[in-house]
């Protein structure tokens, strides 16, 4: 029996993780469950899976939750609650499904407590890859990818020698606006952006997919997960989202992992791999029905977010933290109708241009850079810049 702590239980990855746990009660048990403000979704899964520890973002949210539960777990709140759930004594593995840089501290706490990590929170590696990798090595835990692209690479590398890898190829759907020109993006709405052609995801990651910042963050994540140089990471557009990513080896052989878009597959593989388990309702891939798969260049002129991500990754140090923080604030501003879609990229590029890189930032410095970037952008918007 593998006991699981889930950080970010009400989002898309969190809900699908709960589904996977419920489908395999003989193998998995939910030990701790942390969520933000979605009491309705939290109530359903907490009552169904009955974790020992429950954490919410605030006391107000917790007070809404308590009368809805059919039993009495141990309650926690806020950032400390995330850490309590991440370090729950009996937990074997922590699924970090929370969105944004808020996932960094509980992830580090879990590693220091000797927990394996099923990483769906890409911002953790983007902002503090050097700290996370050092902690993983020091405490001897496993860092397992949940993102479909990184799970695909992880599976392709099973049994292979790292020195035989020539490059990795991340596939990207192109997002909601893949068939629109740059000029046509000037007036797109939030509703347009949230209509992803292939995946069912949360609002933030759906916007990131439309800008391609999501793929950019995945480039930086891949650099840390697989110890690969940025020059050996390629991004290509693949509109069907059937090939989740590929690995090219030095003999020119290419291995790819295919499947219908369903995040429960990567989640389950992170929890059970290399053993493979069935997933109820997982549609089998029928290539005869699909007929054709398409691939295109991911043009940096069409997708400046990709260029910015590679630049931030190569700059290293604190620059990826700036990229991530600026993007998180900009996406929130767009979702709230305060800026246009194309201004997301501009705000990120401006923040990076202002920043003086700290080469080997401490956790405290990362958190301070994150805070300062967010504050600066918010003040600029309020001041009418």
Curated annotation (Swiss-Prot):
Binding site for 1-deoxy-D-xylulose 5-phosphate: 122, 148-149, 173, 196, 209, 214-215, 218
GO biological process, one term: isopentenyl diphosphate biosynthetic process, methylerythritol 4-phosphate pathway involved in terpenoid biosynthetic process
Sorted UniProt keywords: Isoprene biosynthesis, Manganese, Metal-binding, NADP, Oxidoreductase
Cofactor: Mg(2+); Mn(2+)
Pathway(s) it belongs to: Isoprenoid biosynthesis; isopentenyl diphosphate biosynthesis via DXP pathway; isopentenyl diphosphate from 1-deoxy-D-xylulose 5-phosphate: step 1/6
The keyword Oxidoreductase is assigned to this record: yes
Protein name: 1-deoxy-D-xylulose 5-phosphate reductoisomerase
EC numbers on record: 1.1.1.267
Function, as annotated: Catalyzes the NADPH-dependent rearrangement and reduction of 1-deoxy-D-xylulose-5-phosphate (DXP) to 2-C-methyl-D-erythritol 4-phosphate (MEP).
Protein family (similarity comment): Belongs to the DXR family.
Record: residues binding NADPH: 10-13, 36, 38, 121, 123, 202
Residues the record lists as binding Mn(2+): 147, 149, 218
Superkingdom assignment: Bacteria
A GO term, aspect molecular function: NADPH binding
InterPro entries: DXP_reductoisomerase, DXP_reductoisomerase_C, DXP_reductoisomerase_N, DXPR_C, DXPR_C_sf, NAD(P)-bd_dom_sf
Organism lineage: Bacteria, Bacillati, Bacillota, Bacilli, Bacillales
Catalysis: reaction(s): 2-C-methyl-D-erythritol 4-phosphate + NADP(+) = 1-deoxy-D-xylulose 5-phosphate + NADPH + H(+)
NCBIfam families per the UniProt record, alphabetical: Dxr (TIGR00243), PRK12464.1 (NF009114)
């Amino acid at each position: 029996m593998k006991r699981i702590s889930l950080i970010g239980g009400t989002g898309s990855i969190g809900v699908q993780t709960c589904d996977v746990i419920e489908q395999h009660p003989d193998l998995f048990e939910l030990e701790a469950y942390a969520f933000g403000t979605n009491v309705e979704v939290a109530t359903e899964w907490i009552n169904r899976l009955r974790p020992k520890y429950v954490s919410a973002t605030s006391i107000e949210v917790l007070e809404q939750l308590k009368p809805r539960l059919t039993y009495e777990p141990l309650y926690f709140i806020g950032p400390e609650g995330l850490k309590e759930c991440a370090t729950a004594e009996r937990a074997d593995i922590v699924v970090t499904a929370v969105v944004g840089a808020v996932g960094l501290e509980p992830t580090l706490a879990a590693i220091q407590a000797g927990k394996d990590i099923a990483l769906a929170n890409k911002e953790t590696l983007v902002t503090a890859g050097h700290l996370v990798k050092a902690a993983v090595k020091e405490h001897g835990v496993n860092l397992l990818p949940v993102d479909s692209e990184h799970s695909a690479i992880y599976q392709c590398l099973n049994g292979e020698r790292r020195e035989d890898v020539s490059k990795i190829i991340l596939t990207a759907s192109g997002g909601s606006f893949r068939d629109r020109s740059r000029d046509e993006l000037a007036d797109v709405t939030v509703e347009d952006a949230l209509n992803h052609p292939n995946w069912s995801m949360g609002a933030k990651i759906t916007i990131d997919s439309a800008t391609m910042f999501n793929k950019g963050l995945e480039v930086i994540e891949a650099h840390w997960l697989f110890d690969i140089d940025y020059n050996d990471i390629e991004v290509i557009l693949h509109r069907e989202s059937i090939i989740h990513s590929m690995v090219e080896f030095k003999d020119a052989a290419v291995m790819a992992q295919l499947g219908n878009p369903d995040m429960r597959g990567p989640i389950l593989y992170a929890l059970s791999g290399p053993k493979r388990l069935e997933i109820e309702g997982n549609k089998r891939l029928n290539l005869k029905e699909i007929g054709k798969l398409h691939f295109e260049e991911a043009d940096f002129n069409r997708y400046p977010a990709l260029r910015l991500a590679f630049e931030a990754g190569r700059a290293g140090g604190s620059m990826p933290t700036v990229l991530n923080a600026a993007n998180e604030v900009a996406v929130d501003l767009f979702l709230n109708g305060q800026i246009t879609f194309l201004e997301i990229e501009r705000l990120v590029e401006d923040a990076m241009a202002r920043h003086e890189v700290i080469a080997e930032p401490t956790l405290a410095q990362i958190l301070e850079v994150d805070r300062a970037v967010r504050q600066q952008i918010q003040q600029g918007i309020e001041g009418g810049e």
